[in-house]
Amino acid sequence: MKQLAQRLFSLALVLALVLGISVQSAQALSLQSPLLAVAEAEIRNEADAQRIEAGGKLDLNNIGVRAFQQFPGMYPYLASKIVLGGPYDSVDDVLKLDLSDRQREVFEQYKENFTVTPPRDALNEGDDRINNGIYR
């Protein structure tokens, strides 16, 4: 009797492997639950939401130092001051920082490329704004 049970179990296991039937695939087949549809509709990506709100400009409250590389004269010193000096209520708040005359000129030159939205936890956790771990 014990051998019969072992053989039946082995046969069932082999059939399941051959036919590709598993617990995950069985669960994947039953995704017609209305609760899952509601949960999927509520999922949103904080980074994408911020990009849409910023309207193509760089958001001073949610970008890292490396984003300033595209503006000559801002990376790394002025960019670090700006990132560490936030959060800001307006782009002009950057001018309240302790900046040299040259740094003020450089910021004024590129000021139209920036905007300010509320800081988002998903984009400001840890030290990612200072060092995002991307190296050349």
Swiss-Prot record:
Gene3D superfamilies associated with the record: Photosystem II 12 kDa extrinsic protein (1.10.150.320)
Primary localization: membrane
Keyword list, A-Z: Electron transport, Membrane, Photosynthesis, Photosystem II, Signal, Thylakoid, Transport
Pfam families noted in UniProt: PsbU
Signal peptide bounds: 1-28
Cellular component annotations (GO), alphabetically ordered: extrinsic component of membrane; photosystem II oxygen evolving complex; plasma membrane-derived thylakoid membrane
Membrane topology: Peripheral membrane protein
Highest taxon of the lineage: Bacteria
HAMAP family: PSII_PsbU
Purpose of the protein: One of the extrinsic, lumenal subunits of photosystem II (PSII). PSII is a light-driven water plastoquinone oxidoreductase, using light energy to abstract electrons from H(2)O, generating a proton gradient subsequently used for ATP formation. The extrinsic proteins stabilize the structure of photosystem II oxygen-evolving complex (OEC), the ion environment of oxygen evolution and protect the OEC against heat-induced inactivation.
UniProt protein name: Photosystem II extrinsic protein U
Organism in which the protein naturally occurs: Synechococcus elongatus (strain ATCC 33912 / PCC 7942 / FACHB-805) (Anacystis nidulans R2)
Lineage: Bacteria, Bacillati, Cyanobacteriota, Cyanophyceae, Synechococcales
